[in-house]
């Protein structure tokens, strides 16, 4: 996996986790508020938010460079299952 892709994926996960914390702690009232502050569309924020709940094994694979080379931020975020096992299966992470 290219270093730029790895960095983009990890940055997206970190942002998504931060946004969820903001909502949970009441620092932001909505995804629309976050989108305005981030100068992004609310749709993009809502697309990325599920990355906050990404399987720890997938995050570790991104960090150590063993994640599939065709993994992208948008591809990973799109229709992300809630189950960690299903997430891992979807991207082809071997057990």
Regions found by a protein language model. Name each.
Residues 1-23:
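Short, Lys/Arg-enriched anionic-surface-contact patches
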Residues 4, 38-40, 48-52:
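C-terminal interaction appendages of subunits in large macromolecular complexes
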Residues 11, 26-27, 37:
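Helix-turn-helix/winged-helix DNA-binding modules
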Residues 25, 48-62:
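Short, solvent-exposed alpha-helical "recognition" segments
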Residues 30-38, 45:
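Short alpha-helical "recognition helix" segments of helix-turn-helix
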Residues 61-95:
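Intrinsically disordered, low-complexity basic tails/linkers immediately adjacent to helix-turn-helix/homeobox/MYB/SANT
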């Amino acid at each position: 996996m290219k270093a730029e892709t790895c960095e983009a994926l990890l940055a997206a996960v970190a942002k998504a986790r931060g946004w969820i914390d903001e909502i949970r702690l009441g620092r932001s009232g909505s995804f629309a508020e976050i989108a305005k502050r981030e100068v992004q569309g609310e749709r993009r924020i809502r697309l990325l938010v599920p990355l906050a709940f990404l399987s720890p094994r997938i995050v570790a694979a991104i960090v150590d460079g063993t994640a599939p080379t065709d993994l992208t931020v948008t591809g990973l975020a799109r229709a992300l299952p809630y189950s960690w096992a299903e997430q891992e299966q979807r991207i082809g992470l071997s057990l």
